[in-house]
Amino acid sequence: PNSEFVADFIGEANFLKGKCVALEDGCGVLQLADTQVRVAAAENMTVGEDYTIVLRPESAGLVPEGNLKCRVVLSCFMGAYQNYHVMVGDTLVKLTDYNPKNHRIYQVGETCALTFEPDGVHVL
């Protein structure tokens, strides 16, 4: 997708806004909230420019510790999967864990960290 409208239209998506602070090893380093994350560099990505990353709920995970701190505001077991809503700064992010029996289940109010692979997001 080349816009937030299209990305949201073709399925559920999270949008995180950040500024490119570096380009290294084929990745862009974006300042998101209070930390920096690596993403696959978009074509013509430029240091100093603002970007939005599109993160699908199934492309993210939660870990006990990490750079991108978040707070769980919804944790809902759905049988075959676990739905989460977390706050990253002031941004609500929705996640789906399709293999919850092999992962820790986070409860509402817990602090943890959002994680994703650099190539697991799309940069707008």
Where are these regions (language model features)?
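Conserved beta-strand-loop-alpha-helix hinge in the C-terminal portion
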Residues: 1-10
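Non-catalytic connector elements of ABC transporters
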Residues: 13-124
